[in-house]
Structures are given as C-alpha cells and as structure tokens.
Amino acid sequence: MAPARGRFLLTLHSHLPLVLGHGRWPHGSDWLCEVTAGCYLPLLEVFERLAADGRRDLATLTLSPVLCEQLAHPSYRPEVETFLEGRLRSARENRGQFEAAGEDALAALTRVWEAEYGRLLARFRALDGDVLGAFRRLAAAGVVELITSAATHGYLPLLGREESVDLQLRLGAASHARHFGAAPRGAWLPECGYRPRYEWSPPAGPLRGKVRRRRRGIEEHLARLGLRYFVTDAHLLRGGEPYSAYRDYYPALRTVAAGADQPAYQRDRTPYRPYLVASRGGEGAAAVFTRDPRTTLQVWSRELGYPGDGRYLEFHKKHAPGGIRYWRVT
C-alpha cells in the first residue's frame, strides 16, 4: 500500500445572529428557516447516507452557540413548518402566474420547487424538528466532529477586556456541552480572528494611548478551557495581505483597508500542516489549522468561485410574492 500523501480536513462553520423574535422578513426567522431548508437538512441527508455506508470521520462542524440556542428554541419548529408550507403554496401560485404569462420554463421550475419543499417538510417532521439532535447523533456515532465558537460570535481580538474573551469562549463551550452532551475539543474563532499575548492600549476613547497592559493570547484562553485547536486564515500564518471578496467593489472598504496595501512581512510557512501556537511568556498552547486559500477563493470569489458560476442559483434574486429563487447566476 502506498504511503498516505496527506490528510484533508473538511471544516464547515455555521453561524446566524439572533433572529427569532425579530419578525420574519427580511432579517427575522425567515433567515433561519431558509438556511434550515437550504443547508442543514440537505447536509444531514448527505451525512446520514454516507454513515449508512459505513463512513466515519467525514467532517468537522461548528454550530455557533447563538445558532444552537435558536435551533433548540420552542418556536423554531413551528416557524420552519410555517415557512415550508408557505413555500409550497407559493410554488403552486407561481405556477399559475407563469402559465398565464406564457413562461413555460419558469412554470416547470415551480414543480421542481414544490417537490423539493414537500420533501424537506416531510424530512423535518420525521426529525420532529430536532435538527440539533440529528447532528448530535452523527457526532456520537463518529460520523462528524462538532466544535464550538464564541458565545455571541464576538470578534475576540478587539474585545477590550480579558473577562469578555474568557466569557465568550467559556459560555460557548458550556452551550456546546449542554446541547451535544460532550465537551468540545476545538473552536472556530469568529472571522478566524486571533491575536497573541502582547502589550495592549485602548484603540479609542479618553484612555487611548495612555495606558498599557499585558493581554493574554487567544490560545491561552482556549487552553484554560481544554480547547485544543482552532482554525485561522493563511495571512495570519504567513503574513501578507488578507483576501477580501468585497473590497474592490466598495470604496468605503478600500478606505478602511488602506493600510493593507502597504508591504507586509511574509514568512515561509505552508498552510497545509498544523502548528502549535504559544505566546512568549504565556501559559498554555493550542494547535492551529489554516484555511486553504484556494478553497477560500472557490467559496467567496465571484470571479473564481461559486458566487459567479452560472450553474448555481442567484442568491439575491427572488420571485415576489413567495420568495422562491428561479434564476441562475448571470
């Protein structure tokens, strides 16, 4: 048998801010229901099918704490059922509208969506609305590994107090243990944000530049909680300019990121191996895995990746009324 050339670690991070209790559209529970129908239920189907074939250790998944609290909330199931039932009605109503307008191709697509939403509704009811429980069972069977994130997805390097960083991670780990029945071994840092131990001064306010104090490295907080690894971006490993999917299209972002155009120190480090992170003078260490830059472009770039590929649905164009997507990327 030929020696293994390497290992591939598929890591999927999922987060949604608190939307339950804030209406339905445009930034209320519809957002949570859409991602349930378009992501969580299909993902569960794939993992369960592979598990039935005896496959294990398929992926590492992060369901952020604030997302888990919503998936476990009593209002989640009725909201999703109402959403899917509404989409079924919309597909039927849209078909009549398209047929009356002579849009035969669009009318045919309504049948595809009617079948899909009907299947998803049946699948959701078969789970008794317990999406978290389905992921928990997969983790218990060794099909996937579940890790945690910061409690409210706060950007840890910019939090001004050590207590804030500690509580974000401590409550995130506690939420994970409560929902999944086991302590997490790793964490996805929000926006892959990391900083080492260093002398810190308030970046704004009356004390800006006037006081300095030693701040712990993020890895020290992780180690205190038994979190053994985290994920970061390639530019934090090697230096250089971070990739931005939006900066070239929004002048305000170019202004904010003007400093990134300056030459940056780069180190000869490969993102295709793990590293142990420890700050000089710190207490505790954690391993780090680095996101593959090419995969990042595939996911986020509209020039090189899925957002600009005509074989995929146009995310931002929906039919009104009803909210169903019938158009591809153009």
Say what each PLM segment does.
Residues 3-107, 124-135, 158, 162, ...:
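Trp/Phe/Arg-rich N-terminal binding region typifying the photolyase-homology
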Residues 3-7, 12-16, 87-160, 165, ...:
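Active-site cores of enzymes that catalyze phosphoryl transfer or operate on phosphate-rich substrates
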Residues 6-9, 56-60, 144-147, 173, ...:
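Beta-sheet entry/capping signal
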Residues 20-23, 70-75, 157-161, 192-220, ...:
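A short acidic (Asp/Glu
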Residues 38, 42, 164-167, 171, ...:
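Generic recognition of stable, solvent-exposed alpha-helical segments in well-folded globular domains
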Residues 46, 50, 168-175, 179, ...:
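Generic, well-ordered alpha-helical scaffold segments in large soluble proteins
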Residues 62-67, 150, 186-193, 235-236:
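Short, solvent-exposed turn/loop segments enriched in Gly/Ser/Thr/Pro and often Arg
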Residues 165-193, 279:
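CE4/NodB-like, metal-dependent polysaccharide N-deacetylase domain
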